[in-house]
Amino acid sequence: MKIMKRVIVALLVAAMAVSVFAACGKGGSGSGVVTLNVFSQRANFEGMQGGWMAAILKDRFGVELNIVKESGNTLTTRMEAGDLGDIVIWGTDGEDYKAAVDAGLLLDWEEQGLLKDYGTYMYEHMQSALEKNRRVSGDGKIHGIGNGIAAEDESGKEQHQEFMYAWELRYDYYVELGCPEVKDLDDLFDVFVQMKENHPTDDEGKETYAVSIWPDWDGNMVMYPKSLASAYYGIDEFALGFYDFTTNEFIDPLRINDDGSYGPYLEMVQYFNRLYRAGLLDPDSDIQKNDQASAKVKSGRTFWSIFNYAGSAQFNSLENLNSGKGMYTVVPEEATPVVYGLSPLGGSSLWTIGSKTKEPELCMQVINWFATPTGNLEQQYGPQGLCWYYDENGKTCFTDLGRTATADQNTELVSDNPDYQKYCGDTFKNGMQQLNNIVWSLDAINPDSGETFNKKGWASEKTPLAEGNIELVWRENNNSNSMDEYLDARGKFVISQKYSYAEGKKDADLKVVWEQVTKSITTWSWKAIEADTEEEFENAINEMLKEAKSYNNGEGYNQCVEWSENEAAILTDIIKEAKSAQN
């Protein structure tokens, strides 16, 4: 194996040279560029990583990344061939990952010092996350590391990530209406109606909607109704349904309450149907992709987003903000959003290395670099020096180009400095990391600066706003300097913290039934959302209930729910054990 050869060579090299090589030296064969094939279950892109990120990786390691996203039977085909790729990124540390471990398709990171010698930053600073993977893997070995990791000393009870469920609304339109009270979803609906009456089209004359959604991120349920349930009731998606971290209860998606009312998921499917029938839901929602929906948000064709990444992150450009436009938090009084906890254990989206790779050390070096503070900042905000830097106090600051590029990702990177020419010539967007996974949590504390990796936590970003910026009005009305500060101070939220839980395996029969049931749920949910009448909606819901419960002699849905309830019981035990250890 190539590892042994390099270890022997390393023993003959001076200690300082070995250290430098392990930390940041180039890998690969001689001066040539090595192509690493990265199979990612999370990627939305397929092809060669390009732009400034490609230049960074080529300069540091002499590598280029060929990204293969999961689609159709891609994973099955690769599993059957016995070769998953060089670097393998998993959506979760559940069934697919464990099957790959059992099949011997993933490297043992501790074999012949691979982690210790070539993953030095992770080895020295992320032991909790590595040990979590050892427990999850089931064979006592470390095969990878998760995402969203926080530093070892910042996982106290009150620590959480940025609020993803931010309840963002076109605040300029909201102020125009006189900032009416929004107590519940009915009040929010009324606000949407008034906004559309006042602004039926965007600046280009195209029709506006309350929201534009997309189906390509659907899973066991349709994503947007599922997410609205999480944003409103403080329950988090779990197996086939939701987990309530307040009551430790599992809630199945097709629940109908004793009084005949719908459970959380069906209630939100009904809400989206209400939007659809009122002309407030983009009619292309069932056929478009995420990037098409994002383009509509950017152009001002939507009023509302559950998510920060699909609202303010898209619309709040400097130009819009300084023109008095912007999306900001207006959360219904009755809403209790879920927010995700920070933990040194990290999340479940794993970085691993395929067992058939010919470049194990190089793969480890690349993953390790992504895990360093510099690597994390560069993949978020661009090349150090060109886009950001540390000031004399060690605090993170944007360059003028970096600030502009992060606000408008279509900004072309340019520089007169010859050291930065290799990163220039294309837009910031075209160089962004396309693997769709990061090792650190964006909201973790950067040990090199003492601030968060998230630019919202930088002292340098807390600058006075320009006159006319709509955020000034929002801040004054909400007595807060940021949306996260407001949501924290509001105090109504639930932290989702799953600790070392990893989803269990399903047997072959359950896998078949699970796929049938979830397909029924998503298919009929969309039909219900786009029903033209109340009668059509009720028929679609009834068909969903009937079909989902028809499989395996009428026991299929119940089997999926029973399996999910057993998993919820395991999670409950893990949570109780973790909290007991903290006290």
Identify the function of each model-found stretch.
Residues 2-3, 12, 20, 24-583:
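Extracytoplasmic/secretory soluble proteins
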Residues 17:
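Terminal recognition/anchoring or ligand-binding modules at protein termini
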